């Protein structure tokens, strides 16, 4: 049986920590190369790929905020950290012949282009990976919110939230060995159980616009491919309008 992807256009949300690998700070080239290779496997299936990357591997605004630096300034610094990560991802992609472009929410002439929706759609339709940098360009909004916003703007079928855990659990599995890994959840379940997956702004944006989110472990080799091919992987978050997934097992 020929395996076909269940999504044709995705928004991949990578945390900055995903690029850390086993390090405590910065970019682990082994982790970066592995993630990019997995993305390349999807390109073979002509899947349109947009990426939003966090900056937590380089900068944590909450730490400086406690030292008295203004929140707005901290958020601006965080935006620049996402640009650094975006440059690293694109450069790695170009080395293995993946055509990719960076569109930044803030002007950075000479470094990357300014975000423009028409430009983004045009690139995606040409099977060029689009990396969305600098969040949404405004303070007080997380990169998770940016991922949901960009996902909606480009008409993504799903937001794939790549994390360091296998999906959404009923409790912290590091603390509670009996924690249950959920296969699928609707947004109301998440709010009712106060599960910490994304900030409320991001979740509300996705919920109100019927945008499904799948949470999975990017550190598991092949997990990204399995998610896109409809294999049982991670946790799907959906609204009642979205049918639950029938897996290609």
UniProtKB/Swiss-Prot annotation:
Pathway participation: Pyrimidine metabolism; CTP biosynthesis via de novo pathway; UDP from UMP (UMPK route): step 1/1
Residues bound to ATP: 13-16, 56, 60, 163, 169, 172
Gene3D superfamilies: Acetylglutamate kinase-like (3.40.1160.10)
Gene that specifies this protein: pyrH
Phylogenetic lineage: Bacteria, Pseudomonadati, Pseudomonadota, Gammaproteobacteria, Candidatus Palibaumannia
Compartments it resides in: Cytoplasm
Protein name per UniProt: Uridylate kinase
Enzyme class: transferase
Any single GO CC term annotated in Swiss-Prot or TrEMBL for this entry: cytosol
Record: residues binding UMP: 55, 75, 136-143
Organism superkingdom: Bacteria
Oligomer and partners: Homohexamer.
Annotated S-S bridges: none
Family recorded in the similarity comment: Belongs to the UMP kinase family.
GO BP terms in the entry: 'de novo' CTP biosynthetic process; UDP biosynthetic process
GO terms of molecular function: ATP binding; UMP kinase activity
Activity regulation annotation text: Inhibited by UTP.
Species per Swiss-Prot/TrEMBL record: Baumannia cicadellinicola subsp. Homalodisca coagulata
Coiled coil, from the record: none
Main location: cytoplasm
């Amino acid at each position: 049986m020929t395996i076909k992807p269940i999504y044709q256009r995705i928004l991949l949300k990578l945390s900055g920590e995903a690029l850390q690998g086993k390090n405590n700070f910065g970019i682990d080239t082994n982790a970066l190369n592995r993630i990019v290779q997995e993305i390349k496997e999807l390109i073979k299936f002509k899947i349109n790929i947009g990426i939003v990357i966090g900056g937590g591997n380089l900068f944590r605004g909450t730490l400086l905020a406690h030292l008295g630096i203004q929140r707005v300034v901290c958020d601006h610094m965080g935006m620049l950290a996402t640009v650094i990560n975006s440059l690293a991802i694109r450069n790695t992609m170009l080395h293995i012949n993946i055509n990719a472009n960076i569109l930044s929410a803030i002007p950075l002439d000479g470094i990357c282009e300014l975000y423009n929706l028409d430009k983004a759609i045009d690139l995606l339709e040409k099977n060029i990976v689009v990396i969305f940098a600098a969040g949404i360009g405004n303070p007080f909004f997380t990169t998770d919110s940016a991922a949901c916003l960009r996902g909606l703007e480009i008409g993504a079928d799903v937001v794939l939230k790549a994390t360091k855990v296998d999906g959404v659990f009923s409790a912290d599995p590091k603390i509670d060995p009996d924690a249950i890994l959920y296969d699928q959840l609707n947004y109301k379940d998440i709010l009712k159980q106060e599960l910490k997956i994304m900030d409320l702004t991001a979740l509300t944006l996705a919920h109100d616009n019927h945008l499904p989110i799948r949470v999975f472990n990017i550190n598991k080799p092949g997990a990204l491919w399995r998610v896109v091919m409809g294999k049982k992987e991670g946790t799907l978050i959906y609204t009642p309008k979205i049918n639950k997934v029938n897996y290609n097992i």
